[in-house]
């Protein structure tokens, strides 16, 4: 039996996915320009919208060009120390650092050199290393997935700002849920991030979803269109629906049997997590919004006790949360 081209795993690039070509190309072109508009991009969206896949696609494309060194960092580890260690381990760079007699022994890297004082500050070490990278005409892209407002991130982004002010070839891609990115950008100590370019991942193009289903399942355009409508442009729903129909081809002919299984998977993988992350007030608002008897905005506002402006704020917040 052929391998299922769809996947339910988060973070890993699926065998089949709909690339966000425009967003990806814009970042690549900016990073490759002589005077980039931004050396940092924040990719945000609801859970399962394809943030990690988009970031990975950008990193892989740049890596293929040969001028880029890609460093993936874990947001829960000391970021500056890990970046220095990973740069030192790069086969193309380590000989340069040794030749330049960088004494990084205090960080557990390489050997100490006679009459060469060890570098004692991690930012100084990173600056020296990036200057070597600059001399050979290369650039460093740092990727960090699923960031939150943590001390690790605050320290790293503050240092990153200093490095780009020194005109060093370091670039940054970070992904995160809307509320986490919003919290980071509004931290008074991280004004640099407030000015960082942000990519908000919108729903996938419905025509692209339809065409992909039509191609993979060899089904009529009308049936593929109906499947696309069931996803509502949600990236994880595109994968889930495709996964189920590949696993059980009878679902392609029997929507009545498909829908309960489809809802169960979305509930287990996404909806339960989204619900637990909502505040009690958010849950109350959603419960009232789901009341089919309340069809007019005015009726909803009165039931919630919201002003027009408050209603708009909540609607926008909940939409961004998924």
Give each language-model segment a name:
Residues 67, 78-109:
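Conserved NTP-binding/hydrolysis module of P-loop NTPases
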Residues 40-41, 56, 60-78:
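Conserved catalytic segments around the Walker B and adjacent sensor/switch elements
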Residues 196-224, 230:
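Conserved small helical "lid"/interfacial subdomain of P-loop NTPases
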Residues 36-57:
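Walker A/P-loop nucleotide-binding motif
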Residues 239-308:
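Winged-helix-like regulatory helical subdomains adjacent to P-loop NTPase cores
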Residues 1-41, 89:
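A short, basic N-terminal segment
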Residues 115-179, 186-187:
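Conserved Walker B catalytic segment
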Residues 304-321:
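Short amphipathic alpha-helical interaction segments
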